[in-house]
């Protein structure tokens, strides 16, 4: 497959938010992880690591391109115009893995072929997760209406855009106890 495939890894990172998070975490985390969600290492203060220096969420800037990071990303993206774009994220610690298909309703400009492809890929993902006994959800949230996400922008440009979300987020730290008494570790993520 790779002989006829071009794979591009989008290196766009929120450097300001990452630095904010890393500096905060290194200041407050102990030598051994504290699994309690009440521990300070799981309670990052405002504005957290999500927004950039101007407190803008880069995950919502694809269409508007108001931030320099997005402009750099789109210059490359629009030059390549990929056929498939996977947008990887972390979500709250108590949510299992998420993958397409997106929640209804789909935006009216999304073609039947794009919908069918996304649904078919989601079924294959679900089959693999079921075989391994891994928790997941799809079709329940994360719609394809707002045009400026990392799955909708590619979809509106004719590609197959998909979001993948795994448990983690800034609250996870190195390890944390989830609501179902499971231990979520950085290694698991």
Describe the residue ranges of each PLM region.
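Predominant activation on well-ordered alpha-helical scaffold segments within soluble catalytic domains
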Residues: 74, 122-126, 161
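Generic serine detector
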Residues: 32, 36-43, 48, 66, ...
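Hard-cation-handling environments
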Residues: 134-189
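Active-site/substrate-binding loop(s) of hydrolase catalytic cores
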Residues: 1-120, 130-131
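Gly/Pro-rich turn-and-neighbor structural signature
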Residues: 4, 126, 130-139
